[in-house]
């Protein structure tokens, strides 16, 4: 029990010195803050995946993976002839809204 407490104190001290001690906890100023950041980032990504569906989430990752400091993922995809199907990005609510707009035309 004391060993676990010492380990936690050591990790907290390293976090306070600016080291990332929890995967996904970048930016947290303490062990607890890093744990909360990592949990929130994980939940945010999972929520987005649920909204977009697996295909949309993969397309978005493909586009994001092409981006650089100089160019957006869209610009790089166009230059390199890589097709990105942005229709897969739309969430369930957007799909319904777009269908309604199409009917109005």
Swiss-Prot record:
InterPro entries xrefs: LEA_5, Sm_Hydphi_plant_seed_CS, Small_hydrophilic_seed_prot
GO biological process, one term: response to abscisic acid
Top-level division of the source organism's lineage: Eukaryota
Cysteine pairs bridged by disulfides in the record: none
Induction: Down-regulated by drought in 30 days after fertilization seeds. Not regulated by drought in leaves, cotyledons, hypocotyls and roots.
Bias type Low complexity, positions: 93-105
Compositional bias of kind Basic and acidic residues: 7-17, 38-52, 71-89
Chain coiled-coil ranges: none
Region (Disordered): 1-105
Tissue: In seeds, expressed in the embryonic axis and in the cotyledons. Not detected in leaves, stems or roots.
Note: Belongs to the 'natively unfolded proteins'. The drying rate significantly affected the structure of the protein.
Family affiliation: Belongs to the small hydrophilic plant seed protein family.
Function: Late embryogenesis abundant (LEA) protein interacting with non-reducing sugars and phospholipids.
Name under which the protein is recorded: Protein SLE2
Naturally occurring in which organism (per UniProt): Glycine max (Soybean)
